[in-house]
Amino acid sequence: MSSVKIECVGSDRYRLGESPVWDEKENSLLCVDITGRKVCRWDAASGQVQALSVDAPVSSVALRKSGDYVITLGTRFAALKWKEQLVTTIAQVDRDKANNRFNDGKVDPAGRYFAGTMAEEIRPAVLERRQGSLYTLCPDHSVVKHFDQVDISNGLDWSLDHKTFFYIDSLSYSVDAFDYDLQTGKIGNRRSVYKLEKEESIPDGMCIDTEGKLWVACYDGGRVIRLDPETGKRIQTVKLPVDKTTSCCFGGKDYSEMYVTSASDGMDREWLSRQPQAGGVFKITGLGVKGIPPYPFAG
């Protein structure tokens, strides 16, 4: 077992850091600060962070095949031109739910952008239940609604054979699997593959490695856990120096580094003084496994 090393990269501290995505072309890590309403890009070579402010809570960012990015902000799917600092709405959802916003999102192997909604939180993890839905933005810019009654739509990824969709609705304290059809993007036959233990707290963002194992960031659990979706067993736990770990992705050279985002919202002064890196982005090396490159949105 190689020795695991954890370091905080960049000096920025986010209120609700989320949605880390590696941009190989730019040798950079993208992420968002949902409540801080900004999309951030950390340059791995220079260590510099560029931030782009937006007009609503921005909950996920993804690469786009034609260049630049797509984001979810408020209840909108939007295109983001980085250099021009230009945001253009592509589609809107949940028009009948003024208190909703998007949460986590990710692009599937066919280039569709999956993202889910939730009610705006009163305080972290406290909100009106079952207000959210899971959506897909297709490359032709049409939107498909998969299901509703979601509490906090969160982590998502696809199996290496593209036959299973993994998904987290945080307050179910479960990592779920669906049968997934790559051709149509349809999902069905939902089942739980892992139930979180008490000390793991709330499942948040998620990614998959090249061995088909899932990595889940545990909000208020201060850790990422590695799960085997076949056996339903936890294989590994990596603890971080902050409690509010929110999401994870692989990146860097050969996708052998893991990046973990975190939050500081909901922490009082005393808590923050104990965890000065809360809201930071962490790089984990020495895990001995690699991830797969993110898929770009095809539209």
Swiss-Prot record:
Task: Provide the GO biological process annotations.
Answer: intracellular calcium ion homeostasis; L-ascorbic acid biosynthetic process; positive regulation of ATP-dependent activity; regulation of calcium-mediated signaling
Q: Which Gene3D superfamilies match?
A: TolB, C-terminal domain
Q: Name one GO molecular function term.
A: gluconolactonase activity
Catalysed reactions listed for this entry: D-glucono-1,5-lactone + H2O = D-gluconate + H(+)
**An example Gene Ontology cellular component term from the record?**
cytoplasm
E.C. number(s) listed in UniProt: 3.1.1.17
What the record notes about the co-factor is: Binds 1 divalent metal cation per subunit. Most active with Zn(2+) and Mn(2+) ions. The physiological cofactor is most likely Ca(2+) or Mg(2+).
Entry binding sites for a divalent metal cation: 18, 154, 204
Q: What subcellular compartments does it reside in?
A: Cytoplasm
Q: What does this protein do?
A: Gluconolactonase with low activity towards other sugar lactones, including gulonolactone and galactonolactone. Catalyzes a key step in ascorbic acid (vitamin C) biosynthesis. Can also hydrolyze diisopropyl phosphorofluoridate and phenylacetate (in vitro). Calcium-binding protein. Modulates Ca(2+) signaling, and Ca(2+)-dependent cellular processes and enzyme activities.
Q: What is this protein called?
A: Regucalcin
Q: Which gene encodes it?
A: RGN
